[in-house]
Amino acid sequence: GYGQTAPYKDRAGHDINYLALAGVASHTGRQDTGPLPLGVQLADVAGGSLHAVVGLLAAVIARQQSGVGQYLDVSMTDCSFSLNAMAGAGYLACGVEPGWENHVLNGGSFYDYYRTRDGRWMSVGSLEPGFMQQLCAALGRPELAAHSVTPERQAVLKQALQVEFEKRSFDQLCELFAGVDACVEPVLSLSEAVEHPQLKARELVSQVPRGDGSTQAQLACPLKFSEGLPAPRHIGVAVGAHSDEVLVALGFGVERIEQLRQAKVVG
């Protein structure tokens, strides 16, 4: 979590801790509620795992060129810190301290989520003028587009947009923006996302053989290769399926293994 060196190298931690220490949580939240507990393991996956893959591939290429292998030290905290791309650049170059809802991408502008009449949510990312004009025209408020270029008018603009979104239901807004290229999309539940035509067409759920003739739905590999897509061949085996083989290899006899099973030490 914290790397192989420095004072925290042996310290315990989890995703939420790495994001906190890396400064990410200090500008990912709301002014009235503070930092948001994310439902995605950002530090673990986007921070640690993906950076580890990049590092491993870079080391393989370096070995091919130099013949020398490397030891890779990947810290989820280090990698989370590097995710402060725009906010970090603003602070290091200009001394601008990022905070909750104080810059374009974290709620400090109209780039945000808006509640619908029936309590659902829509995402609005219409940053560019063309997209903003499409957004305002679709809502029947073309005059609002002029406010998007002035930082001091952001609060007024957000309030006006919220009023317009709350006039309509979630389904009405989905239908309204289905044919409008304005960077406006619905906030879907996971069950809705699984059934969305875009995600279904991208084959993001795979059916993996169980070994008994049935299949198990799992998240598919999101990478698309020109020469075919890696496919999982099985879902694994049940816990305890190889207990006997493991115990025999460790020197346990048949009678002792049965005793352990009766005592529910092993499955």
What is the role of each PLM region?
Residues 1-122, 126-127:
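Active-site-adjacent "lid/gating" segments in soluble enzymes
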Residues 15, 56, 67, 135, ...:
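Residue-level signal for nonpolar/aromatic packing positions in well-ordered secondary structure
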Residues 51-59, 87, 134-138, 160, ...:
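Alpha-helical scaffold segments in soluble metabolic enzymes
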Residues 105, 110-184:
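Aromatic-enriched alpha-helical interface/lid elements that frame and gate functional surfaces
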Residues 146-161, 188-195, 256-267:
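Short linear loop/turn motifs
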Residues 151, 210-261:
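Flexible, small-/acidic-enriched active-site or ligand-binding loops
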Residues 179-233:
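A glycine-rich dinucleotide-binding beta-alpha-beta segment and adjacent secondary-structure elements
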